[in-house]
Regions:
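Bacterial Sec-dependent N-terminal signal peptides
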Residues: 1-24, 674
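A sensor for short, sequence-defined functional sites
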Residues: 20-674
């Protein structure tokens, strides 16, 4: 998997005109007086100092546990930077397996009449939010924020797990100094992985931890037989020894901010980060256990998990319904579609992710609600029951990132995949307006992994192989200096899905507001929407539009914008270069056929020339053709994007094509009196 962020670390000596003290509580008057970041004067805030420490501690009877300690000091320059004063720390919290946040303290510093004043973070600024059934966001909001404030806070996370969370090395604001340290007992071997273009390297050293380790049985180091991280002691006999720590440190200055660009799937996918994959555990008895995995290992481990497999294979609760919905159907693909549509209507998604069931498939079926695992493992079971070759496809949602190596921990979602006649059919029954091979937006994230009971697996593309189409037809004429138009739009596939998801329960007034172009003077009326509820059809719209701003009378000549209020007004791609891909979401075709009646007594004296622009490798194209036919101005415009993701090396070509689009769509037709 290729990432497109290049992290350039440059040392700027003498850039900060004062010596900073990085100890907690030692905020200086000079830091408070600083009006803007010397290197990034437009930033709303800067991390002055960030420290992130990971270590493992031995506790008799419990084994090793992980402790994470974080300290951050942030300078806020503008009110727009106040969002950095609210911090969320995600911790695992499910049943008896939980991480605990503690030792939280923080202060806000302000300069008042030349004196440094500080205000303590109080309990009324600390609160928790449940993210899902497995994670909590421990949040706190710093008090008395002002432009010019400096905030600092520190906290610890106690974790019973050996897995080390990904360590972010870059934010959307600059980081002036960052220190990372990991102290890892010699028994635990990790593979350190970074974004391929994030130029980082850790210094390495060793020390001796003077702690006696008493080992009971084979699992005494805090690794369970299946899930690494949880302590399971047992057996007879014991031994003791001290151990050494492997120490990894990173100390960097002036880390640039992650640039916010338009059309990005998930900006966090491209930030610099350090990933630590548990590869092996060697306990003092010398019995190694490997955790490095291939995709075959991942597949085997999932199919060995009873909580997953038993739910996927459970089938006694739906058989009467299954018989009814497949009655009279002989074609396997018809059975597949019938079952898929039934599950979509039967069980509603509770907004919780995860490829493991939450309520259990039977309970979800009976109560009509469940998480992603409940719904789609149920779907797989029903498809298998009618002898379709259905298996799970694991994936990571856009918000969860992209797995860099074979792992089951990088996935947070499961869909159904059916292999039939050398074709693969993907289905997600949690999304009522999706369809076969048309996944919801949250699930279209690079590749998934189809896993089979025989231990084999394969990568699966999650983007559709065909374009979604939107077609717009306009009949217009100029009446009393105002362009009056009748518009018909047909939205297919993902265009229809997105419209339904946004407006299915909305009144017409909300839909009219959604149709109005931003910063355009357009009145829309008489809106009719057909097939909004029918997932198998296009969404069809028709409405009347009045647009006075698209025509201008200058000295008796009429200057008309033939694209009306559909013109692309500005190029979304303004940066000179780009470090990450352009994400369009899915292939699409956007086509306009516009017919404008030439006013009586006028003739066309200037008409925009046609163009045809193409991106290389058939990634996309743009066609514009205007002509005068039988008293009408006829305009045909089509934008086609065939690649849902266009790599950063092709950015300049995309930018150039959109420059042409903006220029062409804002050209005028000139009408003069005949």
């Amino acid at each position: 998997m290729k990432f497109f962020l290049t992290l350039t670390i440059t040392l700027f000596f003498g850039l900060t005109p004062y010596c900073q003290n990085y100890k907690f509580g030692k905020v200086s008057k000079e830091e408070l007086e600083e009006k803007s970041d010397p290197q990034y004067p437009d930033t709303d805030a800067t991390v002055l100092y960030r420290e992130y420490n990971v270590k493992f501690e031995w506790t008799q009877g419990s084994g090793f546990s992980q402790e994470i300690e974080v300290f951050e000091r942030v300078k806020i320059y503008k009110p727009e930077g106040f969002s950095w004063g609210t911090v969320g720390v995600k911790t695992f919290n499910h049943d008896k397996s939980r991480e605990e946040l503690g030792s939280l303290k923080g202060y806000t510093y302000n300069l008042e009449n030349g004196s440094v004043e500080k205000e303590k973070l109080k309990s009324n600024g600390i609160f928790d939010e449940r993210i899902n059934n497995y994670y909590i966001s421990n949040k706190f909001t710093m008090p008395n924020l002002k432009a010019g404030s400096v905030i600092e806070y520190t906290y610890k996370i106690a974790s019973p797990f050996l897995q080390i969370d990904d360590i972010d090395l870059q934010y959307t604001i600059p980081i002036r100094k960052e220190v990372i340290e990991l102290k890892i007992p010699e028994y635990f071997i990790y593979n350190q992985v970074s974004n391929p273009q994030a130029k980082i390297s850790f210094d390495y050293s060793r020390d001796t931890e003077n702690v006696d380790v008493v080992v009971r049985g084979r699992s005494g180091l805090g690794t369970a037989s299946y899930d690494p991280g949880m302590d399971r002691t047992g057996g007879h006999g014991s031994s003791s020894s001290s151990y050494k720590n492997n120490i990894f440190t990173l100390d960097e200055m002036n880390i640039p901010p992650l640039t916010v660009e338009p059309l990005v799937d998930n900006l966090s996918n491209y930030r610099a980060k350090s990933i630590w994959e548990l590869a092996m555990v060697n306990d003092p008895n010398g019995i190694p256990k490997s955790y490095s995995t291939t995709w075959e290992d991942v597949t085997k481990s999932i199919y060995e998990n009873d909580a997953f497999v038993n739910q996927m294979n459970r089938d006694g609760y739906y058989e009467s319904d299954l018989s009814t919905i497949t009655d009279g159907l002989d074609d396997p693909l018809q059975k597949m579609a019938a079952i898929y549509n039934f599950v979509k209507s039967k069980v509603r998604w509770n907004q919780y992710l995860g490829y493991f069931p939450e309520n259990g498939v039977k309970k979800a079926y009976n109560e009509g609600i469940g998480n992603i695992g409940d719904i789609n493992l149920m779907l797989i079971s029903m498809l298998k029951k009618v002898n379709l070759n259905a298996n799970p496809v694991l994936l990571s949602t856009k918000s969860n990132g992209i797995p860099l190596f074979p792992t089951r921990y990088g996935f947070n979602y499961v869909i159904a995949g059916v292999e039939f006649n050398d074709k693969l059919y993907l289905m997600d029954a949690s999304a009522p307006f999706s369809n076969i091979n048309m996944l919801p937006g949250r699930a279209m994230n690079w590749q998934g992994r189809l896993i089979r009971p025989d231990g084999t697996s394969q990568g699966v593309g999650l983007y559709p192989g065909y374009p979604s189409k939107e077609q717009t037809y306009v009949q217009a004429e100029i009446i009393n200096g105002v362009l009056e138009a009748r518009v018909r739009q047909r939205k297919g596939d993902h265009f229809a899905r997105e419209y339904r998801e946004e407006f299915v329960n909305s009144p017409l007034e909300s839909q009219i507001s959604g149709l109005k172009p931003e910063n355009e003077i357009v009145e829309i009326s008489e809106l009719e929407v057909k097939d909004l509820q029918s997932n198998s059809e296009n969404v069809n719209l028709s409405y009347k539009a009045s647009a006075p701003a698209v025509i201008e009378d200058i000295n008796g000549e009429l200057y008309l914008s033939p694209m009306l209020f559909f013109a692309q007004k500005e190029n979304p791609f303004k940066a000179e270069s780009r470090d990450y891909p352009v994400y369009f979401g899915y292939p699409f075709s956007n086509k306009y056929n516009i017919n404008i009646k030439i006013p009586e007594g006028y003739k066309v004296t200037s008409l925009p020339e046609g163009i045809k622009a193409n991106l290389s490798n058939n990634m996309g194209s743009y066609t514009y053709l205007a002509k005068e036919v039988g008293g009408m101005i006829q305009l045909s415009v089509e934008l086609e994007i065939n690649a849902p993701i266009i790599l950063s090396q092709d950015y300049q070509f995309v930018k150039a094509m959109f420059t042409q689009i903006v220029e062409k769509e804002n050209e005028k037709v000139v009408l003069t009196k005949a």
